[in-house]
Amino acid sequence: MKYLITITKELVHEYHLYYMQQNPKCKSLPFAKKETIKLFNKNGTPQLTKSGAQKTKKKSISKKNYKMSDCLYGILSLNELLVIQNRMVMNGIKHHWGNLGIWLADKYNLSNLKLSNCMVEFRVFSETLAKKDNDNISGGIKFVGDGLFVQSGFLEDDNYMIINPLLINCGYDKLNPRTEIRISVFPDELKDVYEKLRIHTENFKEGGV
């Protein structure tokens, strides 16, 4: 048995529409790119750097300025997580990603399946040729996985007795950037990782998805 979950900008936009229904007073959206704003002094003059350029800062894009092309499709990176020093901000991010995971499980009819033996592969296809580290998205995988795998009841748990192995790889697709979550399910008695990999490869070989 296999499952394929594909996260695209279109899918995240669909989640944002749901999010706005649930949170009608929200001013920004959890999975949208930040917008760059110019900084001004109280008298209206621009704030300048030492080199004379106008200072800017990034902030969450407002709901009124948001459009589907602003949606994120990739998993949060460790680089993005490690710079967060405020515990409340970190907890808020974990909460949003967990809720997205629960929503994905509901959308794909995976909630409460309580599966007990599987392997999971995360594949992130970027729209640029930036050379990303595969392990850089491991932190983000944990956040979305808590909602998708555990809180939704899709799996019994997310420990290594349930998910083993876990694969991470990155790729490039300018026309269709996305994150694929590929899941192969096995009988409880199958523990050999290499046999699982063989079956998983057959499940998702080119043209077999």
Region spans (language model):
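Catalytic phosphate/metal-binding cores of nucleic-acid and nucleotide-processing enzymes, i.e., regions
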Residues: M1-V209
